[in-house]
Amino acid sequence: MMEAQQQPSAGSLSWRLSSHPITLLTFLAFRVSSLLVYLFGLIFIDNMVMIFIITILLLAADFYYLKNIAGRRLVGLRWWNEVDPQSGDSHWVFESSEPGTKTVNPTDSRFFWLAIYAQPLLWIGLAVLALVRLKFIWLPLVAIALVLTITNSLAFSRCDKFSQASNLAGSAFSTGNLAGSIATGLVGRLFSRS
């Protein structure tokens, strides 16, 4: 007799449960490809400059895809940087989907947040490895990778906190009670400070 195949539970790390499997697989491919080229590039390509260029291009593609496509489709979050033309001050702008319009798939969310936080840690490990092995020539590439991955990690973390605070204030405000007004005022003041 054939046993019935067990279906993975919602939120488990199975790409088949994703609401956007192509977006998820592309996101994961970009996340992993730069690390793989950095780690195994010298085995297949005997040219450090070519490995450097390919890794930088993959990191840039990953940064763009994560910031503009994967974040919006997988977890309903997006961020960008705006510069005030009069003062020249720069500030981040966070956008999240409306609570009632998009339901975030738990599988997409787990893959997204795991990849967001794991990649900077892996690059830090590779920086330590480059230092231990006295391969200082690779440190600029690792530094660029860290800047790009940590920027996205920080921005999406702040965007998620902003989204949760906005949703909390919005739900409190919609009840029309005194606590709702206080919560809305506090959250409004918190995010209006520059």
Swiss-Prot record:
GO terms for cellular component: Golgi membrane. It is found in: Golgi apparatus membrane. GO terms for biological process: protein secretion; vesicle-mediated transport. The keyword Transmembrane applies. InterPro entries: TVP23-like (IPR008564). Disulfide bonds: none annotated. Keywords: Golgi apparatus, Membrane, Transmembrane, Transmembrane helix. Its main location: Golgi. Belongs to the TVP23 family. The chain crosses the membrane at residues 17-37, 39-59, 111-131, 136-156. This is Golgi apparatus membrane protein TVP23. The keyword Transmembrane applies. Golgi membrane protein involved in vesicular trafficking. It is a multi-pass membrane protein.
